[in-house]
């Protein structure tokens, strides 16, 4: 007979005396990642490889609360501190193609310097350039040019008037043009009456000569216009010469300050050239022209094109930047080009370009959240393009998606120099590998964070330092004494479901740390003890166990049928785990088996009702294999049996109840009652070995609570797979009940051990002839199967005899003459 488990195997207990501190306040806070050696090595590799093709980006995989973000920030801060600061990034006006602003990269801190230099320089030029036009030399040379062209202009006009008089016309200037008037013989202009009184042939002659005069005037006016243009050109060239002479030294000085920065020098040259070519804004002191409309019109700033838009200022950076983007929308990643509305029209310019995370992280590291990034398909597709092209391009999202949009700026793309780190689940990683062919090419490093680590003395001491770190980071968290640390370590072991492991789900641990500190404060304690941790865990269970308590109430009141006393054949208490968010609990269920003569074999009622999953169906098929090997070596199995989870109305899956179902079948076949004070969990293989399952602690505790609610008898307990013993981390109440003999836990390795414990009857072993003793469970099963076989055989024989009798009677009836056969009139 199987012996129940010893108390010391039901739960790992951490000894507070193994810690040599008074409270965690005496410890150095943990400043490193523990239990994630594999992931740490992957991070070192990914951060250490500098690939010009941007293929060694990192995907950090793992469950929530495993310290992924903390580890990434820790390593990135160390790695970035040893790297040089990236350059500042600026955008400036493109004087050749204004809709394509140019980028400029400068050493860290010099972007703002360049902006300030240009602001001050333009302000100085706005004051100094007008003075160039007020100088005596400029005025004298301008006067000389004006006089030279004025004389030529006067000469041309005099020639025009003289030739007009020779043709018999005089010229009259008006505000709207020039009139030609015919002259009389006396040299006076003809009046309209005098002209009308002339003979027709005389008038025709005047009109002919008038056409010649107008052509003459047109020719001379064109020459005058050319003279005016030449004068304006000379004046402009003089102005350019004067301004260039004035501003060149200051621009040369700027070139000297930015020597070696080719893009800056190009911009300085372009600004100098544009100022010289467009002096009107400076001559008018930058004042807007008077609007021709009766209301004020917005005017463009003529000096904005000489400013510098600093997108990224790395003057205060220590090493390479580390940017964490929690909301990876397209504008947040790639930046945006803002617009403002004037008179109903959206306008923009280079000064309205705003940076994205990629710009701020350029030359360093960008950390993204996978759940957020991959919900935003546009962001992911654009990011892949940026990595492959190795450039950061700001585009209109509507245009990128193929929708029509107003043509706007297309800033020159910036070189892409970023190491990407995406943090997400292993599930997303597998999906990307399967469905996105680019992902594997661009993310060659996977840092896989596990949920557990080995429970060693070193890790237990590190856990104490982790609690010290929690206290230092959270003012509301009190220090833990050794008993409190021990309870937290036990809880960390409990989370893993393995006595040899500690949980790496630090998020879950921190929640209990804060709650335990809260309960300590309510008792006016200056530190957290083991009792406070226990209370925090109990209070959390109380907040979450409403459904669990309701199910126990229904079992206690008899609404749900679960027996915890007595015996019954073909009926076993199975155990399942229900997961309600972050709270899991065990629920006992009655499993019954009904056996009768027939050829239906093993019928799974859950499967027939379409309430059973594939894994559960597999477990039922395994039962058929076990029964066939044990009891069908000499004759086929000739019985029908049905299995059911009683009062189950939802989907059932998993094979953890397959051993329980097998016990129910064996009990029904052997007609041996099973102890109802025992519950069973564990899967079984075709050889009868009981295999480990999940949720063993919740299942045991769930049945214990039901037994406690209905009344503990001292005979109650749970059969678990022997392979699950190392997974036991039962609550202290259950451990105490086992210690006092009120409850029991039995490790089962084979079906034989389990059926013997449940029925109190030996399972039985085959003798030399291959038969089981009649007074054993298997012997009784064989007897029942033989009985059913004989019954089926007799039934089949009777069916054959009845069939033969029916056939004989039919033949005899066919041989007799009928009245119709004797009818002489029948042809």
Named regions from a protein language model:
Residues 16, 349-358, 364-377, 381-383, ...:
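Peripheral, non-AAA+ core regions of ATP-driven protein-machinery
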Residues 1-433, 438-456, 460, 464-482, ...:
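Conserved ASCE/P-loop NTPase catalytic core
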């Amino acid at each position: 007979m199987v012996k129940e488990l010893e108390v010391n195997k039901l739960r790992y207990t951490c000894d507070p005396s193994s810690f040599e501190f008074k409270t965690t306040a005496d410890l150095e806070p943990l400043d490193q990642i523990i239990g994630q050696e594999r992931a740490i090595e992957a991070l070192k590799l990914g951060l250490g490889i500098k690939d010009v093709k941007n293929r060694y980006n990192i995907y950090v995989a793992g469950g929530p609360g495993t310290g992924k973000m903390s580890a990434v920030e820790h390593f990135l801060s160390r790695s970035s501190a040893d790297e040089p600061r990236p350059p500042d990034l600026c955008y400036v006006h493109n004087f050749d193609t204004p809709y394509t602003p140019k980028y400029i990269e400068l050493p860290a801190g010099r972007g703002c310097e360049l902006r300030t230099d240009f602001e001050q320089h333009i302000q100085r030029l706005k004051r100094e350039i007008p003075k160039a036009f007020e100088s005596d030399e400029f005025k004298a040379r301008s006067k000389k040019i004006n006089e030279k062209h004025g004389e030529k202009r006067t000469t041309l006009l005099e020639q025009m008037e003289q030739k007009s008089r020779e043709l018999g016309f005089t010229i009259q200037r008006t505000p709207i043009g020039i009139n030609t008037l015919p002259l009389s013989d006396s040299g006076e202009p003809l009046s309209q009456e005098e002209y009308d009184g002339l003979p027709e042939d005389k008038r025709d002659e005047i009109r002919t000569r008038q056409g010649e005069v107008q052509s003459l005037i047109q020719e001379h006016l064109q020459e005058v216009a050319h003279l005016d243009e030449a004068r304006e050109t000379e004046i402009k060239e003089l102005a350019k010469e004067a301004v260039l002479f004035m501003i060149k030294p200051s621009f040369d000085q700027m070139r000297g300050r930015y020597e070696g920065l080719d893009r800056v020098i190009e911009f300085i040259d372009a600004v100098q050239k544009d100022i010289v070519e467009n002096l009107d804004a400076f001559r008018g002191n930058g004042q807007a022209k008077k609007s021709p409309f009766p209301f004020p019109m917005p005017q463009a700033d003529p000096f904005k094109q000489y400013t510098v838009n600093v997108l990224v200022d790395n003057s205060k950076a220590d090493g390479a930047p580390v940017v964490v983007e929690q909301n990876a929308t397209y504008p947040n990643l790639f930046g945006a080009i803002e617009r403002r509305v004037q008179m109903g029209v959206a306008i923009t310019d280079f000064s309205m370009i705003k940076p994205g995370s990629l710009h701020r992280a350029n030359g360093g590291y960008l950390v993204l959240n996978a759940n957020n990034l991959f919900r935003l398909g546009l962001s992911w597709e654009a990011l892949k393009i940026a990595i492959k092209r190795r450039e950061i391009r700001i585009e209109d999202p509507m245009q990128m998606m193929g929708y029509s949009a107003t043509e706007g700026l297309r800033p020159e793309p910036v070189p892409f120099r970023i190491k990407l780190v995406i943090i997400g689940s292993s599930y997303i990683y597998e999906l990307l590998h399967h469905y996105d062919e680019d992902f594997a090419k661009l993310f060659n490093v996977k840092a896989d964070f596990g949920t557990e680590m080995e429970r060693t003395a070193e890790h237990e001491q590190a856990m104490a330092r982790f609690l010290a770190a929690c206290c230092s980071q959270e003012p509301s968290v009190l220090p833990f004494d050794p008993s409190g640390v021990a309870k937290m370590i036990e809880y960390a072991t409990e989370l893993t479901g393995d006595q040899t492991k500690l949980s790496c789900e630090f998020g879950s641990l921190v929640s209990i740390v804060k709650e335990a500190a809260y309960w300590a404060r309510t008792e006016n304690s200056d530190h957290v003890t083991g009792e406070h941790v226990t209370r925090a865990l109990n209070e959390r269970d109380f907040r979450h166990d409403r459904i669990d308590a309701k199910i126990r109430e229904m079992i206690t009141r008899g609404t749900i049928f679960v027996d915890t006393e007595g015996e019954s054949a073909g009926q076993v208490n199975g155990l399942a785990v229900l997961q309600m968010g972050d709270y899991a609990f065990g629920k006992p269920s009655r499993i019954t088996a009904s056996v009768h003569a027939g050829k239906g074999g093993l019928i799974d009622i859950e499967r027939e009702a379409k309430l059973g999953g594939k894994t559960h169906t597999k477990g039922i098929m395994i039962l058929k294999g076990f029964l066939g090997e044990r009891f069908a070596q000499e004759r086929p199995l000739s019985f029908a049996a049905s299995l059911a989870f009683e009062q189950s109305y939802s989907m059932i899956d998993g094979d953890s109840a397959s051993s329980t179902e097998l016990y129910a079948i064996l009990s029904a076949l052997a007609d041996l009652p099973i102890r109802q004070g025992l519950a069973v969990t564990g899967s079984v293989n075709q050889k009868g070995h009981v295999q480990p399952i999940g949720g063993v602690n919740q299942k045991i505790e769930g049945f214990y609570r039901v037994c406690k609610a209905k009344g503990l008898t001292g005979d109650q307990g749970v059969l678990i797979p022997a392979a699950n013993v190392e997974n036991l981390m039962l609550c202290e109440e259950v451990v105490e009940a086992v210690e006092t003999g009120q409850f029991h836990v039995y490790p089962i390795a084979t079906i034989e051990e389990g059926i013997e414990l449940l029925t109190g009857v030996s399972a039985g072993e085959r003798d030399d002839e291959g038969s089981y003793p009649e007074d054993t469970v298997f012997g009784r099963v064989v007897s029942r199967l033989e009985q059913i076989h004989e019954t089926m055989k007799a039934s089949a024989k009777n069916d054959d005899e009845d069939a033969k009798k029916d056939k004989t009677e039919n033949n005899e009836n066919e041989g007799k003459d009928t009245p119709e056969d004797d009818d002489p009139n029948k042809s």
